[in-house]
Amino acid sequence: MNRRNFLQQMSVLAALPAVSLMWPLRLAAMGINPAIVPLNKPHEAWRGLVAPEAYRILFEEQTEEPGSSELNGEERDGTFICAACYLPLFESRNKYESGSGWPSFTQPIAGHVGTKADYQLIFLRTEYHCARCGGHQGHVFKDGPPPRGERWCNNGLALKFVLQTESLSALRN
């Protein structure tokens, strides 16, 4: 190893602490709570843990048919959790009937979802996913009720509902 290569490698090592300190800032910029540790689990590993239809939505970013989810009519008090890793994503008090055919919410639990640009349909949409397992949940639109004006439109198969009187499931790895 010559001196130049040695110095280059040492400069990379010296930068590692700074990069690791920036990771929480990157998560926060994506709207993710830095206290939620993303799972380092390949999507394929979830195949045996969730139903095939849920897998297609969560990890292949498919969309269920509008009006097909039993969660559309869910009005009881409770929490909607990710169907893959069980991270709480929405509180029932933020659910409303949007007329879209999908369970809709005015806001997620702060820091429990991340967003990204989605160009699958020619125009730009904002896709959101579970901050922990990365499972696709749905899209957020700017046509919701006041005061936020947001409609978090979720695939019902990407969620599970837990009644307020029941204990939340332990997070699944």
Where do the protein language model's features map onto the residues?
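Short cysteine-rich clusters marking metal-coordination/redox-active sites
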Residues: 82, 130-133
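Residues immediately within or flanking Cys/His clusters that coordinate Zn2+
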Residues: 79, 127, 150
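Mid-length scaffold segments of soluble, non-membrane domains
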Residues: 75-104
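Short, non-ligating residues that shape and space the ligands of small metal-coordination modules
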Residues: 91-92, 139-140, 162
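N-terminal secretory signal peptides and thylakoid transit peptides that target proteins
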Residues: 1-17
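Cys/His-coordinated zinc-binding microdomains
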Residues: 86, 134, 157
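N-terminal post-signal-peptidase region of extra-cytosolic proteins
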Residues: 58-75
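C-terminal segment of N-terminal export signals and the immediately downstream linker at the start
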Residues: 21-57, 65, 173
